[in-house]
Amino acid sequence: MAFAVSTACRPSLLLPPRQRSSPPRPRPLLCTPSTAAFRRGALSATTTPTPARAALPSTTGRNRIVCGKVSKGSAAPNFTLRDQDGRAVSLSKFKGRPVVVYFYPADETPGCTKQACAFRDSYEKFKKAGAEVIGISGDDAASHKEFKKKYKLPFTLLSDEGNKVRKEWGVPADLFGTLPGRQTYVLDKNGVVQYIYNNQFQPEKHIGETLKILQSL
């Protein structure tokens, strides 16, 4: 009987190791990586996209609000900028006739060159409508002069360095604020905005759309 008791006790001594090996080990292993991840900042990679995504819509949202600065039916704000020859030109100078003011990203870029040449090729139609065409970008006067000469542009190019007028008029940027917007305004002879057209990636469409409006004034 003494031997039977001793053999019965031996299995009971083996039970504690079994309990230690199964429940406690998974629990620490599951908890340790997550806390370590927070301490080491390993989760920063997952949290970084969240603010980035939130920031992008906020810039586009600001642009939409700014876009309301000059709207259809409002009087276009006057400005004075330097032309391709360095002369000061004011918008008020053209009062008494329709004016097409088109903002574009930059000289010598593919889309802007197409747009400028399309305005050039249809310039006689604008003259028949009694309208003046003015192109505005952030390039300096020297860049405008070269651009105008190279493509034989018959209309005025104005230098808005620092994009002051662009901001005052509320021209919205594209690609989350990284690309200056391409926007055209049609003003009647009293300087009132009759039409606003925005199309960054089809620059030549600006010409046909603005001519339709001019011919109806």
Curated annotation (Swiss-Prot):
Residues forming the catalytic site: 112 (cysteine sulfenic acid (-soh) intermediate)
Keyword Secreted among UniProt keywords: no
Catalytic reactions of this protein: a hydroperoxide + [thioredoxin]-dithiol = an alcohol + [thioredoxin]-disulfide + H2O
Thioredoxin domain location: 70-217
Pfam families: AhpC-TSA
One GO MF term: thioredoxin peroxidase activity
EC primary class: oxidoreductase
Highest rank taxon of the organism: Eukaryota
UniProt keyword annotation of Plastid present: yes
InterPro entries: AhpC/TSA, Peroxiredoxin_BCP/PrxQ, Thioredoxin-like_sf, Thioredoxin_domain
Disulfides per UniProt: 112-117
Compartments where found: Plastid, Chloroplast thylakoid lumen
Described purpose of this protein according to its UniProt entry: Thiol-specific peroxidase that catalyzes the reduction of hydrogen peroxide and organic hydroperoxides to water and alcohols, respectively. Plays a role in cell protection against oxidative stress by detoxifying peroxides.
Extra information: The active site is a conserved redox-active cysteine residue, the peroxidatic cysteine (C(P)), which makes the nucleophilic attack on the peroxide substrate. The peroxide oxidizes the C(P)-SH to cysteine sulfenic acid (C(P)-SOH), which then reacts with another cysteine residue, the resolving cysteine (C(R)), to form a disulfide bridge. The disulfide is subsequently reduced by an appropriate electron donor to complete the catalytic cycle. In this atypical 2-Cys peroxiredoxin, C(R) is present in the same subunit to form an intramolecular disulfide.
Subunit description: Monomer.
Family that this chain belongs to: Belongs to the peroxiredoxin family. BCP/PrxQ subfamily.
Protein name: Peroxiredoxin Q, chloroplastic
Protein species of origin: Oryza sativa subsp. japonica (Rice)
